[in-house]
Amino acid sequence: MTQLSSSDVPGMGRRQFMNLLTFGSVTGVALGALYPVANYFIPPKAAGSGGGTSAKDELGNPITASGWLSSHPEGDRSLVQGLKGDPTYLIVEGEDAIGSYGINAICTHLGCVVPWNSGANKFMCPCHGSQYDSTGKVVRGPAPLSLALANVSVENDNVFVSQWTETDFRTGDKPWWA
């Protein structure tokens, strides 16, 4: 076998170089644009030993039980970011107790966020008038189902929200959202 000298080896042409440069640039931009899309489909990491996600306030800061209880009176239902970032109501059951369940605030009719009406002691959807009692059970349509529930636990003063898989205590049925 004979070896070619450096003058006999064909160099990379300008066209081939520009094609490689363009391909590399387009590939880099495409991967950079697809990263957030792919990351959206990856569920958040579990926090706490209960396997839930940390409840967060409107700014995305983790909620502590002591801080929440000091600023929310008994019977209060206020929104936090729960599972999958869905708005979820935390319920204050006493001076020093957060309820063991949270209520997903997404209406089962068309997906509107349902506000708590403390004067009427129920959740009232502003979109089409669906109403839910204080536990999230549907009492007036057009919503076909009760609001979804989530387990709420407190570990080392941190509040965690996890998937509700037990029987729905409001209806006695298997949860429709699980």
UniProtKB/Swiss-Prot annotation:
[2Fe-2S] cluster binds at C107, H109, C125, H128. Disulfide bonds join C112-C127. Residues 65-161 form the Rieske domain. Its cofactor is [2Fe-2S] cluster. This is Cytochrome b6-f complex iron-sulfur subunit. HAMAP family: Cytb6_f_Rieske (MF_01335). One of its GO terms (molecular function) is plastoquinol--plastocyanin reductase activity. It is found in: Cellular thylakoid membrane. Keywords: 2Fe-2S, Disulfide bond, Electron transport, Iron, Iron-sulfur, Membrane, Metal-binding, Thylakoid, Translocase, Transmembrane, Transmembrane helix, Transport. The chain crosses the membrane at residues 20-42. Component of the cytochrome b6-f complex, which mediates electron transfer between photosystem II (PSII) and photosystem I (PSI), cyclic electron flow around PSI, and state transitions. It holds the Pfam family TM_PetC. InterPro entries: Cyt_b6_f_Rieske (IPR023960), Rieske_2Fe-2S (IPR017941), Rieske_2Fe-2S_sf (IPR036922), Rieske_Fe-S_prot (IPR014349), Rieske_Fe-S_prot_C (IPR005805), TAT_signal (IPR006311). The Rieske iron-sulfur protein is a high potential 2Fe-2S protein. It catalyses: 2 oxidized [plastocyanin] + a plastoquinol + 2 H(+)(in) = 2 reduced [plastocyanin] + a plastoquinone + 4 H(+)(out). The 4 large subunits of the cytochrome b6-f complex are cytochrome b6, subunit IV (17 kDa polypeptide, PetD), cytochrome f and the Rieske protein, while the 4 small subunits are PetG, PetL, PetM and PetN. The complex functions as a dimer. One of its GO terms (cellular component) is plasma membrane-derived thylakoid membrane. Its EC number is 7.1.1.6. Belongs to the Rieske iron-sulfur protein family. The keyword Iron-sulfur applies.
